[in-house]
Amino acid sequence: MNHRLSALVNGGFLSENEANKLMHDMMSGFLTDAEVAASLSILAHRGETAEEMTGFVKAMRQNAAPMERALDVVDTCGTGGDGLSTFNISTAAAIVRSAAGAKIAKHGNRSVSSKSGSADVLECLGIHIQSTPEETRRQIQEKNMGFLFAPLYHSSMKQVAAVRKQLGFRTVFNLLGPLCHPMQAKKQIIGVYSKEKAKLMAEALAPLEPEHVLFVCGEDGLDELTITANSYVIELKKDVMTEYTLNPEDFGLQKGYLSEIQVQSPEESAKLIQNILNHQTEGAPLHITALNAGAALYVAGKSESLMAGTLKAIETIKNGAAKEQLARLKQKTREEEIYA
């Protein structure tokens, strides 16, 4: 038995270095499926430590496909797993904030447990998702937004894919995904399904020199800034961590209902997003998109506050800029035509 796994089995905790090596063993295929399943099950049962998480993140970043990190980008990504079947809020918000001037490197995947993953809905919107790293950089430079399809950058995850599917419950990989952006984005909005895990992820990311990151969790269980209740926020700005609660009504946004933002398929999600960007819908769908887009504009340094960012996002939708941005993102480059 792998000695690091043995330590877990015997109730021990791993140092950052030990966790790093255990993750490398998983990613390299050195562990058997039974050993991977045992490791993930033990961690899920007792909970991961921040030190272990930092070691895991470093290993996953080291195993990811290399990509130049010169661009000043913002990512919005979530752990998923909230089970609330909402439309792809962070994807809609990404389009809005890219229309407002922020450079977005959207990291995502197809759906695993939700009704619609970010890759699924972008395809339904007619946006190419499987671009090369070079093409993605050009998209970000020229259109302010590019999509980083996770399987293209984290191919070593195939070593644990079958085990994760068989286990059928949340594992540490749900938490690691948002922390392992291929461009190692220093500015992020990370949605988390619980306050406890948000705090854990913030503590794990802090030693890795983030510039400005918001970890957000709705009191309704949504892994976004929500419109139906208050939201819990951990703001990590360089080495300063601040915790606070946001009430959407403080932003002049009327609280809505989950039923107003729930969908049953990627196609339904895409249709709602189009209506939002075309300013053909009001209420909760528009407000939750603007709230999350505004948060990223704040993190990107395009707005002085969350309030100012939210107002800017609403104006970006109302003046037609978001609609125009969607049309730009749909336009294929010559390279995309070749690989389509």
From Swiss-Prot:
Q: Which gene encodes it?
A: trpD
Among HAMAP family, the record links this protein to: TrpD
> Out of the domains of life, which is the source?
Bacteria
The record lists Mg(2+) 2 as bound by: D223, E224
Q: Which Pfam families match?
A: Glycos_trans_3N, Glycos_transf_3
Detail which positions bind anthranilate 2. Answer: R164
Q: What does this protein do?
A: Catalyzes the transfer of the phosphoribosyl group of 5-phosphorylribose-1-pyrophosphate (PRPP) to anthranilate to yield N-(5'-phosphoribosyl)-anthranilate (PRA).
Q: What is this protein called?
A: Anthranilate phosphoribosyltransferase
UniProt binding sites for anthranilate 1: G78, N109
Q: Which GO terms describe its cellular component?
A: cytosol
This enzyme catalyses: N-(5-phospho-beta-D-ribosyl)anthranilate + diphosphate = 5-phospho-alpha-D-ribose 1-diphosphate + anthranilate
Query: Per the UniProt record, which EC number(s) apply here?
Result: 2.4.2.18
The residues that the entry says bind 5-phospho-alpha-D-ribose 1-diphosphate are 78, 81-82, 86, 88-91, 106-114, 118
Q: Name one GO molecular function term.
A: magnesium ion binding
